[in-house]
Amino acid sequence: MANKPLMLMNGGMYHDNLDAVGLYVEKGVEAQKISTKGGWGNFHLLPNGVFWGKDGRLGVTETKTYIKRGIKPDFATQSGPMLVIEGKLHRRFLVDSDSRKIRNGVGISRDGKTIHFAISHRAVTFWEFGTLFRDQLKTPNALFLDGTVSSIQTAGTKRGGWRQIGPIISVSAKRPN
């Protein structure tokens, strides 16, 4: 029996049929292949990346690097753009951008022991959201998960409109052995 989720968050972009736009792996089974195709929209604001887990290890990795490493994850979701890449903000982010949305994302601490999920309280730019991960959360790599439909649910907190959405990240307490 599965543990009750401590947190639920939409976990990446999806098509009208709710399939993930890019890589989606659940319980070691690849449901959607990794995408390296060009296109429009935030997903294709390259570089994009992959949030993944393997044998208790977590990562946020730029897509090309992920492919080169040949990672075979237990779970993964691909989205984009990367917010922070090796400690630097995505090169296409503008400090004075007028594109403001509610945004959510994920980053992993440098030592790999702390995962940070974040959702903005108000509409923010990619620059503002990226600086949260780089400067305050100190994550060397962080990934944008989604914008307009950003949602999170934790004990006592429910933000965003819960409607049918694509990938969902669920975090549960570790099961006792």
Predicted regions and their residues:
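Gly/Ser/Thr/Pro-rich low-complexity, intrinsically disordered segments
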Residues: 1-177
